[in-house]
Amino acid sequence: MEIWTEKYRPKRIDDIINQEEIKKALKSFVEKKNMPHLLFAGPPGTGKTTAALALAHELYGDAWRENFLELNASDERGIDVIRHKVKEFARAKPIGDVPFKIVFLDEADALTRDAQQALRRIMEKYSQSTRFILSCNYFSKIIEPIQSRVTVFKFKPLEKEAFRELINRIVKGEGLILENEDEIINALYDIAEGDLRKAINILQAAAMMSKTITVDRLYEIASIAKPKEIDEVLNKAMQGNFLEARSMLIDLMLKYGMSGEDVIKAIQKRVWSLPISDREKLMILDKIGDIEFRIVEGADDLVQLDALLAWLGLGKYKNFTS
Protein backbone atom coordinates (compact mmCIF):
# COMPACT_ATOMS: atom_id res chain seq x y z
CA MET A 1 0.00 0.00 0.00
CA GLU A 2 1.31 3.43 -0.97
CA ILE A 3 1.88 5.90 1.85
CA TRP A 4 -0.65 8.70 1.44
CA THR A 5 1.68 11.46 2.66
CA GLU A 6 3.84 10.72 -0.40
CA LYS A 7 0.98 9.89 -2.77
CA TYR A 8 -0.70 13.25 -2.18
CA ARG A 9 2.41 15.37 -1.67
CA PRO A 10 2.34 18.38 -4.06
CA LYS A 11 4.96 18.10 -6.81
CA ARG A 12 4.73 21.70 -8.02
CA ILE A 13 5.23 24.96 -6.15
CA ASP A 14 1.80 26.22 -7.28
CA ASP A 15 0.15 23.23 -5.59
CA ILE A 16 1.49 24.14 -2.14
CA ILE A 17 -1.32 25.51 0.03
CA ASN A 18 -1.29 28.27 2.65
CA GLN A 19 2.25 29.63 2.08
CA GLU A 20 1.68 32.28 -0.60
CA GLU A 21 4.65 34.57 0.07
CA ILE A 22 7.03 31.62 0.27
CA LYS A 23 5.67 30.28 -3.03
CA LYS A 24 6.39 33.61 -4.74
CA ALA A 25 9.99 33.54 -3.55
CA LEU A 26 10.54 29.92 -4.61
CA LYS A 27 9.13 30.60 -8.09
CA SER A 28 11.51 33.55 -8.39
CA PHE A 29 14.45 31.24 -7.59
CA VAL A 30 13.30 28.87 -10.34
CA GLU A 31 13.02 31.68 -12.89
CA LYS A 32 16.48 33.06 -12.07
CA LYS A 33 18.04 29.60 -11.61
CA ASN A 34 19.79 31.01 -8.59
CA MET A 35 19.11 31.03 -4.85
CA PRO A 36 20.80 31.68 -1.49
CA HIS A 37 21.06 29.18 1.34
CA LEU A 38 17.60 28.83 2.89
CA LEU A 39 16.18 28.06 6.32
CA PHE A 40 12.62 26.72 6.50
CA ALA A 41 11.25 27.17 10.02
CA GLY A 42 7.87 26.15 11.36
CA PRO A 43 5.82 23.46 13.12
CA PRO A 44 5.82 19.85 11.86
CA GLY A 45 3.57 19.04 8.91
CA THR A 46 3.35 22.58 7.51
CA GLY A 47 5.03 21.83 4.17
CA LYS A 48 8.75 22.47 4.69
CA THR A 49 9.93 19.22 3.08
CA THR A 50 7.25 19.51 0.39
CA ALA A 51 8.47 23.00 -0.52
CA ALA A 52 12.08 21.81 -0.81
CA LEU A 53 11.08 18.88 -3.02
CA ALA A 54 8.81 21.02 -5.21
CA LEU A 55 11.65 23.53 -5.67
CA ALA A 56 13.98 20.70 -6.72
CA HIS A 57 11.40 19.28 -9.15
CA GLU A 58 10.96 22.64 -10.88
CA LEU A 59 14.66 23.56 -10.93
CA TYR A 60 15.99 20.26 -12.24
CA GLY A 61 13.04 18.53 -13.91
CA ASP A 62 13.63 14.81 -14.45
CA ALA A 63 17.20 15.13 -13.12
CA TRP A 64 16.08 16.33 -9.67
CA ARG A 65 17.14 13.13 -7.91
CA GLU A 66 20.73 13.48 -9.12
CA ASN A 67 20.88 17.10 -7.96
CA PHE A 68 19.09 16.85 -4.59
CA LEU A 69 20.45 15.26 -1.42
CA GLU A 70 18.10 14.84 1.54
CA LEU A 71 19.56 14.26 5.00
CA ASN A 72 17.97 14.14 8.43
CA ALA A 73 20.00 15.50 11.33
CA SER A 74 18.19 13.19 13.76
CA ASP A 75 18.90 10.06 11.72
CA GLU A 76 22.50 10.67 10.73
CA ARG A 77 25.15 9.38 13.14
CA GLY A 78 26.94 12.70 13.51
CA ILE A 79 28.28 15.75 11.75
CA ASP A 80 31.16 13.69 10.32
CA VAL A 81 28.68 11.49 8.45
CA ILE A 82 26.89 14.58 7.12
CA ARG A 83 30.25 16.11 6.09
CA HIS A 84 31.23 12.92 4.22
CA LYS A 85 27.90 12.64 2.38
CA VAL A 86 27.93 16.31 1.39
CA LYS A 87 31.53 16.02 0.16
CA GLU A 88 30.70 13.00 -2.01
CA PHE A 89 27.54 14.68 -3.33
CA ALA A 90 29.17 18.05 -4.08
CA ARG A 91 32.13 16.46 -5.86
CA ALA A 92 30.15 15.69 -9.03
CA LYS A 93 28.99 18.56 -11.24
CA PRO A 94 25.26 19.37 -11.41
CA ILE A 95 23.29 17.74 -14.20
CA GLY A 96 21.51 20.31 -16.38
CA ASP A 97 21.78 24.08 -16.70
CA VAL A 98 21.40 24.99 -13.01
CA PRO A 99 24.91 25.71 -11.69
CA PHE A 100 24.44 24.21 -8.23
CA LYS A 101 23.03 21.21 -6.38
CA ILE A 102 20.79 21.31 -3.31
CA VAL A 103 21.41 19.69 0.08
CA PHE A 104 18.25 19.54 2.20
CA LEU A 105 18.99 19.00 5.90
CA ASP A 106 15.83 18.25 7.86
CA GLU A 107 15.56 18.78 11.63
CA ALA A 108 18.69 20.94 11.68
CA ASP A 109 17.67 22.15 15.14
CA ALA A 110 18.42 18.64 16.44
CA LEU A 111 22.13 19.29 15.94
CA THR A 112 24.19 20.42 18.93
CA ARG A 113 25.72 23.91 18.88
CA ASP A 114 29.15 22.41 18.11
CA ALA A 115 27.67 20.38 15.26
CA GLN A 116 25.96 23.49 13.91
CA GLN A 117 29.29 25.34 13.96
CA ALA A 118 30.75 22.48 11.92
CA LEU A 119 27.75 22.65 9.59
CA ARG A 120 28.37 26.37 9.06
CA ARG A 121 31.92 25.58 7.92
CA ILE A 122 30.62 22.86 5.59
CA MET A 123 28.14 25.33 4.05
CA GLU A 124 30.93 27.85 3.45
CA LYS A 125 33.29 25.27 1.97
CA TYR A 126 30.82 23.96 -0.62
CA SER A 127 28.87 27.16 -1.35
CA GLN A 128 30.28 27.43 -4.89
CA SER A 129 28.65 24.20 -6.05
CA THR A 130 25.93 23.60 -3.48
CA ARG A 131 23.01 25.41 -1.87
CA PHE A 132 21.77 24.29 1.51
CA ILE A 133 18.14 24.25 2.63
CA LEU A 134 17.90 23.72 6.37
CA SER A 135 14.60 22.79 7.99
CA CYS A 136 13.75 23.22 11.66
CA ASN A 137 10.79 23.31 14.02
CA TYR A 138 12.39 25.85 16.36
CA PHE A 139 14.15 28.81 14.75
CA SER A 140 15.60 29.87 18.11
CA LYS A 141 17.63 26.64 18.28
CA ILE A 142 19.63 27.57 15.18
CA ILE A 143 22.86 29.40 16.03
CA GLU A 144 23.22 33.02 14.92
CA PRO A 145 26.20 32.38 12.58
CA ILE A 146 23.94 30.10 10.51
CA GLN A 147 20.92 32.43 10.77
CA SER A 148 23.03 35.25 9.31
CA ARG A 149 24.04 33.12 6.31
CA VAL A 150 20.58 32.02 5.20
CA THR A 151 17.31 33.50 3.97
CA VAL A 152 14.64 32.53 6.49
CA PHE A 153 11.14 31.43 5.51
CA LYS A 154 8.69 30.86 8.36
CA PHE A 155 5.95 28.34 7.59
CA LYS A 156 2.61 28.85 9.30
CA PRO A 157 0.17 26.11 10.35
CA LEU A 158 -2.61 25.28 7.91
CA GLU A 159 -5.83 27.21 8.34
CA LYS A 160 -8.82 24.95 8.86
CA GLU A 161 -10.40 25.55 5.44
CA ALA A 162 -7.16 24.72 3.63
CA PHE A 163 -6.86 21.67 5.88
CA ARG A 164 -10.42 20.65 4.96
CA GLU A 165 -9.69 21.03 1.25
CA LEU A 166 -6.66 18.73 1.41
CA ILE A 167 -8.38 16.09 3.55
CA ASN A 168 -11.42 16.06 1.25
CA ARG A 169 -9.12 15.58 -1.75
CA ILE A 170 -7.77 12.42 -0.12
CA VAL A 171 -11.24 11.26 0.95
CA LYS A 172 -12.43 11.55 -2.66
CA GLY A 173 -9.30 9.96 -4.10
CA GLU A 174 -9.49 6.95 -1.77
CA GLY A 175 -13.27 6.52 -1.87
CA LEU A 176 -13.73 7.07 1.86
CA ILE A 177 -17.01 7.79 3.64
CA LEU A 178 -17.03 10.36 6.43
CA GLU A 179 -19.69 9.60 9.03
CA ASN A 180 -19.98 13.34 9.73
CA GLU A 181 -17.71 15.59 7.66
CA ASP A 182 -17.58 18.57 10.02
CA GLU A 183 -16.93 16.41 13.08
CA ILE A 184 -14.27 14.37 11.28
CA ILE A 185 -12.44 17.48 10.01
CA ASN A 186 -12.62 19.15 13.43
CA ALA A 187 -11.38 15.98 15.15
CA LEU A 188 -8.45 15.53 12.76
CA TYR A 189 -7.53 19.21 13.06
CA ASP A 190 -7.68 19.00 16.87
CA ILE A 191 -5.68 15.77 17.07
CA ALA A 192 -2.99 16.83 14.58
CA GLU A 193 -2.73 20.43 15.85
CA GLY A 194 -2.13 21.74 12.33
CA ASP A 195 0.31 18.95 11.40
CA LEU A 196 -1.04 17.78 8.04
CA ARG A 197 1.36 14.84 7.82
CA LYS A 198 0.13 13.52 11.17
CA ALA A 199 -3.50 14.00 10.13
CA ILE A 200 -3.01 12.09 6.87
CA ASN A 201 -1.24 9.21 8.64
CA ILE A 202 -4.09 8.91 11.16
CA LEU A 203 -6.66 9.01 8.36
CA GLN A 204 -4.84 6.26 6.45
CA ALA A 205 -4.63 4.10 9.57
CA ALA A 206 -8.37 4.53 10.11
CA ALA A 207 -9.08 3.69 6.45
CA MET A 208 -7.15 0.41 6.77
CA MET A 209 -9.76 -0.68 9.32
CA SER A 210 -12.82 0.59 7.44
CA LYS A 211 -13.64 2.86 4.50
CA THR A 212 -16.19 4.53 6.78
CA ILE A 213 -14.35 7.00 9.01
CA THR A 214 -15.72 7.80 12.47
CA VAL A 215 -14.62 10.29 15.11
CA ASP A 216 -14.26 7.56 17.72
CA ARG A 217 -11.84 5.59 15.54
CA LEU A 218 -9.67 8.65 14.88
CA TYR A 219 -9.20 9.32 18.59
CA GLU A 220 -8.54 5.63 19.30
CA ILE A 221 -5.83 5.49 16.63
CA ALA A 222 -4.27 8.72 17.90
CA SER A 223 -4.41 7.40 21.50
CA ILE A 224 -5.98 10.66 22.64
CA ALA A 225 -9.15 11.11 24.69
CA LYS A 226 -11.95 13.08 23.07
CA PRO A 227 -12.32 16.68 24.32
CA LYS A 228 -15.77 15.98 25.78
CA GLU A 229 -14.33 13.07 27.79
CA ILE A 230 -11.67 15.31 29.33
CA ASP A 231 -14.36 17.93 30.00
CA GLU A 232 -16.40 15.36 31.92
CA VAL A 233 -13.43 14.47 34.13
CA LEU A 234 -12.72 18.14 34.86
CA ASN A 235 -16.36 18.90 35.62
CA LYS A 236 -16.64 15.97 38.04
CA ALA A 237 -13.43 17.00 39.79
CA MET A 238 -14.49 20.64 40.09
CA GLN A 239 -17.85 19.55 41.52
CA GLY A 240 -15.96 17.74 44.28
CA ASN A 241 -16.68 14.23 42.95
CA PHE A 242 -13.07 13.09 43.34
CA LEU A 243 -13.62 9.31 43.23
CA GLU A 244 -15.84 9.51 40.16
CA ALA A 245 -13.43 11.83 38.37
CA ARG A 246 -10.50 9.57 39.25
CA SER A 247 -12.32 6.47 38.02
CA MET A 248 -13.23 8.17 34.73
CA LEU A 249 -9.65 9.35 34.25
CA ILE A 250 -8.18 5.88 34.86
CA ASP A 251 -10.68 4.42 32.37
CA LEU A 252 -9.54 6.95 29.76
CA MET A 253 -5.87 6.21 30.38
CA LEU A 254 -6.49 2.48 29.93
CA LYS A 255 -8.77 2.92 26.91
CA TYR A 256 -6.39 5.16 24.97
CA GLY A 257 -3.07 4.10 26.46
CA MET A 258 -2.41 7.64 27.68
CA SER A 259 0.55 8.52 29.88
CA GLY A 260 0.45 11.15 32.59
CA GLU A 261 2.03 13.66 30.21
CA ASP A 262 -0.62 12.86 27.59
CA VAL A 263 -3.36 13.54 30.14
CA ILE A 264 -1.77 16.82 31.22
CA LYS A 265 -1.53 17.98 27.61
CA ALA A 266 -5.18 17.07 26.99
CA ILE A 267 -6.29 18.93 30.12
CA GLN A 268 -4.23 22.00 29.20
CA LYS A 269 -6.09 22.23 25.88
CA ARG A 270 -9.50 22.12 27.59
CA VAL A 271 -8.93 24.58 30.43
CA TRP A 272 -9.83 27.59 28.29
CA SER A 273 -13.25 26.06 27.59
CA LEU A 274 -14.16 25.89 31.29
CA PRO A 275 -17.01 28.21 32.45
CA ILE A 276 -14.82 30.10 34.94
CA SER A 277 -12.96 33.42 34.97
CA ASP A 278 -9.76 33.92 33.02
CA ARG A 279 -7.84 34.42 36.26
CA GLU A 280 -9.10 31.08 37.57
CA LYS A 281 -8.07 29.44 34.30
CA LEU A 282 -4.59 30.89 34.71
CA MET A 283 -4.39 29.51 38.24
CA ILE A 284 -5.31 26.04 36.96
CA LEU A 285 -2.74 26.25 34.16
CA ASP A 286 -0.09 27.28 36.67
CA LYS A 287 -0.93 24.26 38.83
CA ILE A 288 -0.91 21.99 35.78
CA GLY A 289 2.58 23.27 34.98
CA ASP A 290 3.77 22.22 38.44
CA ILE A 291 2.21 18.77 38.04
CA GLU A 292 3.74 18.32 34.58
CA PHE A 293 7.18 19.27 35.89
CA ARG A 294 6.95 16.66 38.65
CA ILE A 295 5.87 13.97 36.19
CA VAL A 296 8.72 14.82 33.81
CA GLU A 297 11.13 14.68 36.75
CA GLY A 298 10.02 11.11 37.47
CA ALA A 299 7.15 11.39 39.97
CA ASP A 300 4.39 8.77 39.76
CA ASP A 301 1.84 9.75 37.08
CA LEU A 302 -1.27 8.65 38.93
CA VAL A 303 -0.24 10.18 42.26
CA GLN A 304 0.31 13.54 40.57
CA LEU A 305 -2.95 13.36 38.62
CA ASP A 306 -4.78 12.45 41.84
CA ALA A 307 -3.27 15.54 43.44
CA LEU A 308 -4.51 17.69 40.56
CA LEU A 309 -8.05 16.30 40.75
CA ALA A 310 -8.12 16.82 44.53
CA TRP A 311 -6.80 20.39 44.13
CA LEU A 312 -9.59 21.13 41.65
CA GLY A 313 -12.18 19.54 43.93
CA LEU A 314 -11.13 21.72 46.85
CA GLY A 315 -11.61 24.81 44.69
CA LYS A 316 -8.07 26.02 45.33
CA TYR A 317 -8.05 27.85 42.00
CA LYS A 318 -10.75 30.18 43.41
CA ASN A 319 -8.49 31.28 46.25
CA PHE A 320 -5.61 32.33 43.95
CA THR A 321 -3.15 30.31 46.05
CA SER A 322 -1.50 26.98 45.37
Curated annotation (Swiss-Prot):
GO terms for cellular component: DNA replication factor C complex. GO terms for biological process: DNA repair; DNA-templated DNA replication. The keyword RNA-binding does not apply. InterPro entries: AAA+_ATPase, ATPase_AAA_core, DNA_pol3_clamp-load_cplx_C, DNA_Rep/Repair_Clamp_Loader, P-loop_NTPase, Rep_factor-C_ssu_arc, Rep_factorC_C, RFC_lid. Belongs to the activator 1 small subunits family. RfcS subfamily. Heteromultimer composed of small subunits (RfcS) and large subunits (RfcL). The gene is rfcS. It comes from the Archaea. This is Replication factor C small subunit. It comes from Nanoarchaeum equitans (strain Kin4-M). GO terms for molecular function: ATP binding; ATP hydrolysis activity; DNA binding; DNA clamp loader activity. Keywords: ATP-binding, DNA replication, Nucleotide-binding.
